[in-house]
Structure formats: C-alpha cells, structure tokens
Amino acid sequence: YEIGVRLVGSEMCIRDRGNGKSTLMKWIYNPSLVENYIEADGERIMGHERLGYLPQEMLDEDKEKTIYEYFSEEEIFWEKTPKELSVIAGKFGMKNDFFYSNQTMGSLSGGEKVKTQLMRLFIRDVSVLLLDEPSNDIDIATLTLLEKIINDWKHIVLFISHDETLIERTANMVIHIEQIIRKTKARYTVAKLPYRRYVEERLHKFEIQKQRALSDRREKKIRDEKYQRVMQSVQGALRSCTRQAPSVAKNLKDKMHTVKAMERRFEKEDENMTQMPEQEEAIFVKLGDENSHIPAGKTVIEYELSKLVTPDGKRILAEGIHLKIKGSEKICMIGANGAGKTTLLKKIAEELLNRNDIKAEYMPQTYEDLLDLDVTPVDYLDKTGDKEERTRIRTYLGSLKYTPDEMEHPIRELSGGQKAKVLLLRMSLSGANVLILDEPTRNFSPLSGPVIRKMLREFPGAVISISHDRKYIEEVCDKIYQLNPNGLQLIGD
C-alpha cells in the first residue's frame, strides 16, 4: 500500500492486526530493519528528530544481558548524574540502584521489561517515541503509568495498540490501516480525531453508505425487471412478425436498438452505483448453546492451594489460595506482573480439563502451547475427517475473514489474531460450558474488541480468566479477584 503522513506534535495510533503496522513502524525508525523482506518506495524526512523505538518483543540478545549491561551500552548513560538517573527511576517507580542490577533482562516481568526499555529511551533524550504494542503483557498499574508517559510527552508519540482504553485516553489522531476485498486491497485512513469520535464517525459513514448501496440495488432490481419485460415483449413481437408486414418489423427493430441502447446505459450506471461498504473486522461465531448453561447451584470448581510456587519450585508466589465458582459466573483474576496468575490458571485448567461432569476448553496466553503449528487450521479443527465437517469448518473460518489460502497454510504462518480465532472456533465447535482464558483479548484489534466482549458476555457457561483489558473486565466479568502473596482477594463483584 501507499501511505503518506506528516507527524507534527501529535500522538497517534495505528490499528488493526496483520496489516504491516509493525513493519511500517520499523521502516520509519530504521529502514535497514525491514529491507530483507519488503520493498519500500518512499522517503523519510526526519529533520532534527531523535527517534526512540520500543519493539513489540524484546530482542533475544538483550534478554541475555544484565540490566547494568543493557544501560551501559548507551554512551550518554555515563554522562548522566546520579540525580538525573534518580529522576528517571522515580518516573517509573523503580529504585535508584535499578540501573546497576545484575539481574538479567529476560528474567524481568512483562511490565518491568517495558519500563526498562522506556527508561533507556529517556536516558537517550529522544524526541519521538515509536511504541509497538507497549501495553502487551503489562499489569494495570503499569498501564496507568504508560498512559501518563504518553500524555505528558511534549512531542510526538506514534504507537500501535489493541488496548481500547489506552487509545481512548491518549491518542488524538488515528492512522487506520486495513485490508479489504478478501485481503486483496490495502486501505488506510488518517483521522485527526480522538479514537472514540473516529469510531462513531466511521460507523455513521458506514451506515449511510450501506443504506445508499441498498437503495441503489433496490432501484436496480426494479429497473432491470422492467427492462426484461420490455426486452421479452420486443423479442416476442419480432419472432411473430411476418414477412408480409415489413413496416411493423422495421418499427420493432428500431425498438430493439433502443432497448439495446438502454442496456448499455444501464451498464454505465451500474459502474457508478454506490458500493457496499466493507470493513476488515471479523464476524465472530457464537460461543455455546442452550446445552452450555450451568445451573446456578452447581459448583464448577472449589479450588484450594496452600502454596503457589514458580514452575521451577524455587519461589513461593502466594499462599492460602481459595476459589469457588458456581453456575455461569464469569470471573477475572488480576495482579502485578509476576504474581503467578498464569501459573495458577494452568493448575485450575489441569483440574477442570480432566473432569467428566463439565466440558472445559483452555486458551493459554502462549497459543503455541496448545496449537499444532505444522497443520492447517482446517486440519486442526477437523475431528472426524468427514467432508461435510470440513466444509462447515471452512464456512466458519470464512466468517472469521480467513482467505481460502490461509485456511490451507500451516498455523505457524498465521498472525497472533488468526491463531486466537482458531482457538475461539475450537471452543465454539466443542460445545464447552466452561472457558479458561489467559488474556483472551490480547491479539484482537480495537474494532474487534466489542464483538469479542459481547460474545463472551453472552456465553451461557462459566468463564475463568486473566486479563488486564479494562473494558473486558468491566463488561464481561461478574467478579474480580486480585492475586497477591496472601492469596486471592475478591475486589469487585
């Protein structure tokens, strides 16, 4: 696609998954990062700006470094006074001696990784922040800090995000990149509007265009039916015309020329007919049915754990954990990064997946833990090998905006959002009445978010989840538990 944007003192948000957003951001930062796999025909006019880039994933080589080694790579780090470093540490809620720690970068929690990388950009005194999914894998406290950093930044912030709350509270301009017409055409929109106004205006324009397109098609149907009646009448008269009535035949032939001219005019009119609007957002399948409902009095799980320890068994994360879920309750566990939420959810999943009185399905935070990456989505979802079953699966995948080509490619080649859709479809097809979800919305675009939340809110069974998505917590969950060293505490009901 072609895109041209002038960045002048505005925060921005690039949205919708799988459309080259990260590639575009890398190209803006440093074209050499993407020259091996894309061809870019354009120019970067940077002026005197100093760019700072936060990648979506920390580089593997950086994970091996100690925190001290990571900061020491910046020459300007050695020019900073202890007071200046103390101010930077304070902004991020870190201790003054954090810069000199021998802890490896890879051992930091998700929130600590984001903070550390941002602190390095602050030390570098950059003027422009380029942030690729900065809200991934961070807790709510760090999200609040990130919002403050973006809002307090005096110059340009260009960020990619799926977090609707973060976007609503920070962005004052939107760059929307999408692929339409079965992903054969790229389209981008630049709107100098806050996110919520952009969504409302987009929906309003969509509805107006849709109504015009429907009106055009109704008028076309009436016109075409009338045209067919005239055409059939003239053709019938010509067939019944005898050689003894040449004047009548001539009149009918003249009429036929007129009818043909009408046809050509109609074809030109049809070329200018209002097109049905297209949006990239996927249409999601329904989760559960009447058999997924769980009686209010039924105990789904009563789980007790004296000690929750890290997977390597070296550290106690929490003690005295107790969780009781009844009926079709939908609960969410929150907590600081590294508190042990995913570890606890895995243990709960192990118990529920082995039960015979319920049908549980699990969506891990790392999809590769469950997906077979070497098979196609159709093969992964097909449990019978029946031709009708495979046709049904393809129909469902099509409703999720998969192209025929994507349906037959190995899962490892799909985007994170496409992998998540495979797991959601698996849950839909399985007839599950208990869903165990680790960050269920993390790989969906902001425009897909409301659809996902509605789908989970209307699911008739129980939901046990982890999330830092504030809209998901507010709209879907009945109860909110916070995991801390003293166990699970109910903080919202």
For each of these PLM feature ranges, what is it?
Residues 1-2:
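Short, exposed "boundary/linker" segments that immediately precede the start
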Residues 5-6, 10-209, 293-493:
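ABC ATP-binding cassette signature C-motif
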Residues 77-104, 111, 201-315:
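Coupling and communication elements adjacent to P-loop NTPase active sites across diverse families
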